[in-house]
Structure formats: structure tokens, C-alpha cells
Amino acid sequence: TTKLYIPPVRPEVVPRPRLIEQFTAGLGHKLTLVSAPAGYGKTTLVSAWLHAADVPFAWLSLDEGDNDPARFFAYLIAALQGIDVEIGRSVQGWLEAPHPPAIESLVTTLINDIARVSTSFVLVLDDHHAITERAIHESIGLLLDRQPSQMHLIIATRHDPPLPLARLRVRGELLELRQSDLRFTAEEATAFLNRSLGLDLSASEVAVLGERTEGWIAGLQLAGLSLQGRDAAGMARFIDEFSGRHQFVLDYLTDEVLKRQAEPVQEFLLRTSILDRLCGSLCDAVVGQDAGPDGAPHQDGQAMLEELQRANLFVVPLDDEREWYRYHHLFAQLLCARLEETRPDLTADLHRRAVAWHEENGLGFG
């Protein structure tokens, strides 16, 4: 099955030695967590490191169908048997039994099998955000708690999994690579646009696109594809006008991000898109306590902002206290465009609420 095969590294992929070094250093930890929104090159980066590193590995690409624990463990064991064919043999028999034992027993047996492996190896769980089944999250948490020293786990995901990350962080057992780490630097953006995509942009043109996209790789790729085949004047005009309202960007963010959110989250995102900076009480004032489209009351603003950050929904914290946030520029532009398109009657009232909150709190707005 293709779920067990590592994606190939294309020749045009931009080398990222600063991140490759971090992966190698991370082998001393239990877990490397690569957590960032869609389009930040998570899978490509993990694949590039494994192709460059001299380390045995097992790869499992997850999807929504893997929320069935029996299916998940079947694929997990198949991946691990690429390291050692004896891993999980007895567990396979249990999975096929009419009344399989408790999942904790399965995981414990699997851990004991891994502990008998003579070589160190890496297990990669890619697209981990597809997993919502609590029993599977608990199984991975148990595996991490008792993880044999031979194994290092890499999880690539669009949002943080419900695992004991705080405990691992305090113990120095966790390496984290996040949106701020994965975004392209100016040098990487130049290499990507001019070498990988075959453009011939000036440093200032690359800088404009880098600033507009905030180093978001998918955004740079969408811009680069749109630039191909244009003359110099057309390129200059496109770069000057490029925003989250560009059709390619609209389509990508709508399909890959916005449509995947629950209705109350979408409503919160749209209503707060008029704000340059967000905090909990400001969001409460703007969103209001009236019920959303599904009849459910809106969630507390601070709790929602914290949830958006955990879910890597293009939210950028502006202070260490996590009081103020902003949306990624292109994402904010998409949300504003969607608000104008779907709820034009709301915009003026949302602005009035925002102005009132700022006046009450002695702050300027706009």
C-alpha cells in the first residue's frame, strides 16, 4: 500500500540545512512534532531528512479511514515490520479475533516487541491531523510514555495532537518545528521562485512576495505558478496586486482550511476578520453572544483564540502572554473577501462593535 511508502524528494526541492540539522539533533528526544498549517512543506521536509539521514525508518501516511483502531494498528504493524518482521506478530492475531483484548494490552505487547529490536529507527506518522479517535490518541500517548530507546517518533500534523506534549516539553523529550520555523527565509524564497520555478525575479520582487505570504510555501508556489509565462510588466503588476483575494489563494485556503472547520469556527473567523489585532474580549464584543447559524451560542473569544492557535489556523500570537493575536495576512484577506461575499449586511455592524470596544477601552481603532 502507498500508505507505507515515503514520498520521493523532487529534484527542485529547496535544501533546508538549518532544519535538517534540527531533525538530526532531535533523535535524542522521544518525539519530533512538526506542526503547522496546510502548505508549509511538512511532509516534504520529513521526507528530505530521511532521504539524507543514514537511519532506518518506518513511514505511515494517515487518513480519516484510520480512525478505526483495528485498521490503524494493522497499518502501524505493517509499517514497523519493515524494520523487523517479528514486531506485532502476536498482535496481528489478536486484531483478527472476534473479541480482541484491551488496546492497552495490544500497545504493551507492541512496545515489548520494539524493545527487542537491535537497531535504532524512526517511526513517522504523517498527516496525523486525520486522527480523531480518542482510543488511538491514548494508544500513541501510552507508546510515548513507555517508548523504547531504540525508537524515535516523528509526527507531522496540521494541528497539535491531544498528547502529553507539556510533560514531554518539561522533560526535554520533545523537539518542535512550527510555522515560524518552517516558513521560507528570504534566501529560501529566492531559491524556490528563481531556481525551482524557473523565474527571474529581483531581490525586491522576492521580498514583496515573501512579505505578503509571510514565508508560507504554498502561497509562494501559487504566486510563482501565476507568474510563469508573464512578461516583465505583467510580473510587476501581478506582484503589486498579489493578495489573499487572488483566485488560486482563495481556492486553496477555502478548500484546505476554511471548509474543514466546524460552522461555529467559520462564523468566528469571518466575523473577526475585520480586526487587525484580536484579543478575547474584543472578539466577544465583535462576534456578539447571539447564536451562530447552527443555533449554538458563540464560544468564549479567548478560548476560541487559544483553540485556533492549537489548530494552527493561520493565527499569529503578538505577545508572550498570548493575549493579542492576528491572522496571517493572506488568510485575513480571504476571510474578508468571504465576509463581503456571503454576509455583506454584517460588515458595518461588526465595525461599529469594534469601534465601541476600542473607545470603551481607551484605544484607537482603524
Please report, for each region that a protein language model flagged, where it lies by residue.
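Conserved adenine-nucleotide phosphate-binding loops and their immediately adjacent elements
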Residues: 1-23, 89-95, 186, 191
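Alpha-helical sensor/transducer elements of the RecA-like P-loop NTPase core
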Residues: 2, 18-19, 44-48, 71-74, ...
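Pre-Walker A (Motif I) flank of P-loop NTPase domains
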Residues: 28-32
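Conserved phosphate-binding/catalytic loops and adjacent sensor/switch elements of nucleotide-binding enzymes
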Residues: 40, 44-121, 128-132, 176
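Conserved nucleotide-binding/hydrolysis micro-motifs of P-loop NTPases
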Residues: 64-67, 130, 159-162, 182-183, ...
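Extended alpha-helical scaffolding segments used for macromolecular assembly and cargo binding
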Residues: 337, 345-366
